[in-house]
Amino acid sequence: MANYFNTLNLRQQLAQLGKCRFMARDEFADGASYLQGKKVVIVGCGAQGLNQGLNMRDSGLDISYALRKEAIAEKRASWRKATENGFKVGTYEELVPQADLVVNLTPDKQHSDVVRSVQPLMKDGAALGYSHGFNIVEVGEQIRKDITVVMVAPKCPGTEVREEYKRGFGVPTLIAVHPENDPKGEGMAIAKAWAAATGGHRAGVLESSFVAEVKSDLMGEQTILCGMLQAGSLLCFDKLVEEGTDPAYAEKLIQFGWETITEALKQGGITLMMDRLSNPAKLRAYALSEQLKEIMAPLFQKHMDDIISGEFSSGMMSDWANDDKNLLTWREETGKTAFETASQFDGKISEQEYFDKGVLMIAMVKAGVELAFETMVDSGIIEESAYYESLHELPLIANTIARKRLYEMNVVISDTAEYGNYLFSYACVPLLKEFMTTLQTGDLGKAVAEGAVDNAQLRDVNEAIRSHAIESVGHTLRGYMKDMKRIAVAG
């Protein structure tokens, strides 16, 4: 198999990278009806598998779970989750031949083995579904020509997919049809019905492509969503302790600071996040973010280049073949860092204190979000896709750090995201070492001193913040998400 994207000519690559259309709500007037009365078999019962299945069943669909024989015989976690929730469970051989739609929600590294097992069992004219297109785009999996291949990719962890559905809402979602596998022209109808069954149509759906979803998803998770948060956590903790801050206080300021800061980002974009600062602090955060963007731009561009070329995927798949040696080594090293092993401060940190004493963290968020967005757009990805893969998902990832630090983040995200996160953070930490020595009092751990502010400078900074392209597209897309619940848990 060959990387699918690399088999396309330049015109085809650009067309698929740039495929992105925000779908009108009336396009989902039929809800999940196209799949009602049909058999949907989900392979895998992890966070996405279970929670999408629960939503789809509650939307009136016939859902069952196909698991490996040994998972059933040994009553593994996937079997327990499916059976405890009242789902029919069977082997591939028992369930797949009757399925109208087989949804592959196993981890990326298992996709080829799963497809190799289920494809011969699928009936003529059935459909195969994914929630991430890595197997199709990067691995270049070849699917039988009579099979329709679709994708429904919720832009949230599986737990959020379920919680928002239970509230009568949903999470923003990308849908796509693989152009090489739509023999009956029904791919879009299947994808729309599946998205509606999960509740995604209530929060906004983008019609995308497998290529655009994969390339933007990889870029977001490697840089701002995971890599920047990990690098920032390690750098900021070490700096605070070096300056004499109690390690326990420093740990709490960072662990819960990302979440508190990005909750403002979720509600009102970079503009609201920056507006939570005093005027002198806002000017300083803006200046720091501009410095960070200049330093980190080549690193962001390298990650995008390696994603576009397939270099990243090739390296990661080589590590898969080597029993995840690099991934497991990096995971162990991260677990031994001073930030991960520090005790936690017992006292309370107020919400505003996280902003006032986290100016550098705010600058890192602003710089990382804007750089990820700009780099994706410069590579041909449409602004709406770039927004969802940068700013939108950041509060959700920050929330995992608030639960159990970097360990929890790396457990919750996919192995693909974790591998890319380590590549970025291992490069970013030394890259910013010299910058960290230039920090001033008030940048981190202490509030910026009050002082005179130049009105013209403040006016220009406010205009620069609000006029960035991500603020414009974000204002529009957040309009569809006003009902999403607040997720921050910091105390």
Swiss-Prot record:
Gene Ontology MF terms in the entry:
ketol-acid reductoisomerase activity; magnesium ion binding
Residues that bind Mg(2+) 1 = 217, 221
Query: What PROSITE patterns does the record tag this protein with?
Result: KARI_C (PS51851), KARI_N (PS51850)
Q: Which SUPFAM superfamilies match?
A: 6-phosphogluconate dehydrogenase C-terminal domain-like, NAD(P)-binding Rossmann-fold domains
- Annotated binding of NADP(+), by residue: 45-48, 68, 76, 78, 108-110, 158
Kindly give the InterPro entries that the UniProt entry links to this protein.
Answer: 6-PGluconate_DH-like_C_sf, 6PGD_dom2, KARI, KARI_C, KARI_N, NAD(P)-bd_dom_sf
Protein's pathway: Amino-acid biosynthesis; L-isoleucine biosynthesis; L-isoleucine from 2-oxobutanoate: step 2/4; Amino-acid biosynthesis; L-valine biosynthesis; L-valine from pyruvate: step 2/4
Which keywords does the record carry?
Answer: Amino-acid biosynthesis, Branched-chain amino acid biosynthesis, Magnesium, Metal-binding, NADP, Oxidoreductase, Repeat
Q: Which residues bind substrate?
A: 414
EC primary class:
oxidoreductase
The active site annotation covers 132
Every KARI N-terminal Rossmann domain range: 15-208
Query: What Gene Ontology terms describe where this protein resides (cellular component)?
Result: cytosol
Tell me the residue numbers annotated for binding Mg(2+) 2. Answer: 217, 389, 393
Q: KARI C-terminal knotted domain: which residues?
A: 209-344, 345-484
Cofactor(s) needed for function = Mg(2+)
Enzyme Commission designation: 1.1.1.86
Q: Which reaction does it catalyse?
A: (2R)-2,3-dihydroxy-3-methylbutanoate + NADP(+) = (2S)-2-acetolactate + NADPH + H(+); (2R,3R)-2,3-dihydroxy-3-methylpentanoate + NADP(+) = (S)-2-ethyl-2-hydroxy-3-oxobutanoate + NADPH + H(+)
The record's cofactor note says:
Binds 2 magnesium ions per subunit.
- One short Pfam family name for this protein? KARI_N
What is known about what this protein does?
Answer: Involved in the biosynthesis of branched-chain amino acids (BCAA). Catalyzes an alkyl-migration followed by a ketol-acid reduction of (S)-2-acetolactate (S2AL) to yield (R)-2,3-dihydroxy-isovalerate. In the isomerase reaction, S2AL is rearranged via a Mg-dependent methyl migration to produce 3-hydroxy-3-methyl-2-ketobutyrate (HMKB). In the reductase reaction, this 2-ketoacid undergoes a metal-dependent reduction by NADPH to yield (R)-2,3-dihydroxy-isovalerate.
Which family does the record assign? Belongs to the ketol-acid reductoisomerase family.
Name the chain's protein. Ketol-acid reductoisomerase (NADP(+))
Q: Which organism is it from?
A: Enterobacter sp. (strain 638)
